[in-house]
């Protein structure tokens, strides 16, 4: 299952990257809406399969690593369920043109859990890099890279670019968007590839 999850994630992550880059450059790409929906779901379900499988192969004495995996699985499951609820109007996003209080609370909750998942990924990466060798050590390095890229793309780069060029400067927005898309796609593909190799070993 981990193999298929990794391949599916790679395919749809690259598709998402192409869509983002073309959108930033103003190039029209006609991707069917059903494919975009499948892409969104796969990018959440594949990490659940990979992190869940990785959690199952950990011995009982790896309590810290097991807890980190559980945080990651919970985040992706919660995000997936919430996206389903919003997509099929099980939870209304807006009412009378305004975002509902429930939607605001749930969005804030998933963002908070997302931050915890990034920290959990970093802790898992540091633990693997310090305690293990071979494929587990390489996975640890990949997870640390995920945190570094997240820190640069979400916090450092946007602030720096907008401070230097101005928030309304179209070049700044395009550069940040494309750099984030490329770096996030590559680092996550590498991390999940390393996780797949670790699971197979």
Segments from the language model and where they lie:
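Internal transmembrane alpha-helix with an interfacial aromatic "cap," most often the third helix
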Residues: 40-74, 83-87, 119-129, 189-199
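Hydrophobic, aromatic-enriched interface-forming segments
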Residues: 70-126
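Membrane-proximal first intracellular loop
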Residues: 1-36, 48, 52-56, 127-140
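Membrane-interfacial loop-to-transmembrane alpha-helix junctions, especially the N-terminal start
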Residues: 1-9, 61-71, 134-144, 200-201
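C-terminal transmembrane-bundle signature of multipass membrane proteins
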Residues: 118-201
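Hydrophobic alpha-helical transmembrane segments of multi-pass membrane proteins
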Residues: 2-24, 72-82, 143-162
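Alpha-helical transmembrane segments of polytopic membrane proteins
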Residues: 15-19, 33-47, 103-118, 172-185
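Interfacial non-cytosolic loop connecting adjacent transmembrane helices
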Residues: 23-35, 89-108, 156-180
């Amino acid at each position: 299952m981990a193999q298929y999850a990794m391949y599916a994630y790679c395919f749809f992550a690259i598709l998402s990257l192409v869509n983002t880059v073309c959108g930033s450059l103003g190039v029209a790409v006609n991707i069917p809406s059903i494919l975009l929906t499948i892409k969104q779901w796969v990018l959440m379900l594949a990490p659940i399969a990979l992190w869940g499988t990785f959690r199952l192969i950990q011995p009982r004495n790896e309590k810290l690593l097991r807890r980190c995996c559980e945080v990651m699985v919970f985040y992706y499951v919660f995000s997936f369920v919430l996206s389903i609820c919003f997509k099929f109007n099980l939870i209304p996003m807006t009412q009378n043109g305004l975002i509902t209080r429930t939607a605001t609370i749930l969005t804030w909750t998933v963002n908070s859990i997302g931050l915890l998942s990034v920290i959990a990924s970093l802790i898992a990466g540091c633990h693997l890099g310090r305690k293990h060798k071979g494929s587990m050590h390489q996975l640890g390095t990949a997870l640390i890279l995920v945190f570094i890229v997240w820190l640069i793309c979400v916090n450092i780069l946007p602030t720096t670019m907008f401070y230097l060029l101005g928030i309304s400067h179209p070049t700044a927005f395009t550069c940040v968007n494309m750099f984030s898309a490329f770096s996030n796609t590559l680092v996550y593909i590498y991390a999940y590839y390393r996780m797949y190799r670790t699971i197979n070993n």
